Regions:
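Bacterial Sec-dependent N-terminal signal peptides
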Residues: 1-29
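Solvent-exposed, well-ordered amphipathic alpha-helical segments
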Residues: 2, 11-16, 130-133, 211-215
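Alpha-helix boundary/interfacial micro-motifs
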Residues: 15, 19, 61, 262-263, ...
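Surface loops and adjacent helix of pleckstrin homology
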Residues: 17, 44, 252
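Structured extracytoplasmic
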Residues: 21-213, 221-228, 299-316
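Gly/Pro-enriched, hydrophobic low-complexity segments
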Residues: 188-194, 203, 212-315
């Protein structure tokens, strides 16, 4: 149970211009968006419902990750683990060339480890780091990026396939319910009529990567509701970046925090994308998170993933 919930929240992905809620070292110093003003959208067929519908129906984020398999690119991966005082305890750095010019090859250009990272048996101390390594170190082999339509954990599938569907829903389609996720599956469904009463909605206008005009649509818990109600809402804020020219989603940030008698977590995640030719591809993924589970070592970690130098693999 612990691994199921931790795996899902570790991998639920996730924009600068948002301060991190956890007060400690932040590896992400890359600023990609400049906001200029609040926006009032007055068109009759364009407003909050337009943004919400785009968020809950979008599958282009998922497709963008799958499209990586056609490209050669360089990935720089940085992982940091922390002690109880939020001082850096361990560091991992990988610079990897994902070479898709011919049969796929993963080439390490740099590989550095420092601090407390491994158990005596050679495995990572933290499950967070283990999951990072499984999913992002080699995205070509990740089970999350299989072909086929998105689902929410349909009946009739094997345990592993249903589990992957849950992960995909939380990562790529926030706002949808996640069937079969213990304790928190219904708390992701923030756009129902009942849940909307607890959230405020705001729009901003800005420029992304110095040239792309964007809207920033933010959903955040209302300030005037009771502390007990706030504590029971898992998603504290959800921010989505839309390209004004075609309404494509280029970025997504989610802040989640929840506590009960079985587990306690505080997680902020971010995913950003940009265009390479006509293709939308991932360029930055960040994570800051604390996990506490009875009788287990508390997990504190952050990571920064940067993808660059994409080019279409030969013959793809």
């Amino acid at each position: 149970m612990r691994k199921l919930i931790l795996f899902i929240l570790t991998t639920a992905l996730t924009l600068p211009g948002f301060g991190q809620a956890i007060d400690r070292f932040n590896p992400d110093t890359i600023k990609t968006i400049e906001l200029d003003s609040n926006v009032k959208i007055t068109a009759r067929k364009f407003g909050i419902e337009t943004f919400i519908n785009a968020i809950v129906t979008d599958e282009t984020f998922y497709q963008a990750f799958r499209n990586m398999k056609k490209y050669t690119f360089t990935a720089e991966n940085r992982i940091y683990t922390y002690d109880k005082k939020n001082q850096v305890e361990g560091k991992i750095y990988r610079k990897i060339r994902h070479n898709n010019d011919g049969p796929y090859k993963m080439e390490y250009l740099a590989k550095e480890d420092a601090g407390k990272l491994f158990k005596k048996n050679g495995k990572y101390q933290l499950y967070t780091v283990e999951m990072f390594d499984y999913i992002f170190m080699n995205p070509y082999n990740s089970d999350l990026l299989t072909e086929g339509p998105m689902t929410t954990g349909a009946k009739g599938k094997g345990a592993n396939e249903g589990y992957k569907d849950k992960l995909k829903t939380l990562i790529f389609s926030p706002g949808r319910p996640i069937k079969g996720l213990p304790f928190i599956g219904d708390k992701t469904q923030i756009f129902t009529a009942n849940m909307r009463q607890y959230y405020d909605y705001s729009y901003d206008s800005g420029v992304y990567l110095d040239s792309i005009p964007v809207y920033r649509f933010k959903v955040a818990i209302k300030k005037d509701i009771s502390s007990g109600t706030k504590d029971d809402l898992m998603i504290k804020s959800l921010v989505t970046i839309f390209d004004k020219r075609n309404f494509a989603i280029l970025g997504r940030y989610v802040d989640m925090k929840y506590s009960n008698m079985l587990f306690d977590f505080d997680v902020q995640m971010n995913i950003e994308m940009t265009y390479f030719g006509e293709e939308k591809l991932p360029t930055k993924i960040t994570y800051q998170g604390n996990w506490d589970y009875p009788f287990k070592k508390e997990e504190r970690a952050s990571f920064l993933i940067v993808h660059k130098d994409y080019h279409l693999g030969k013959g793809k």
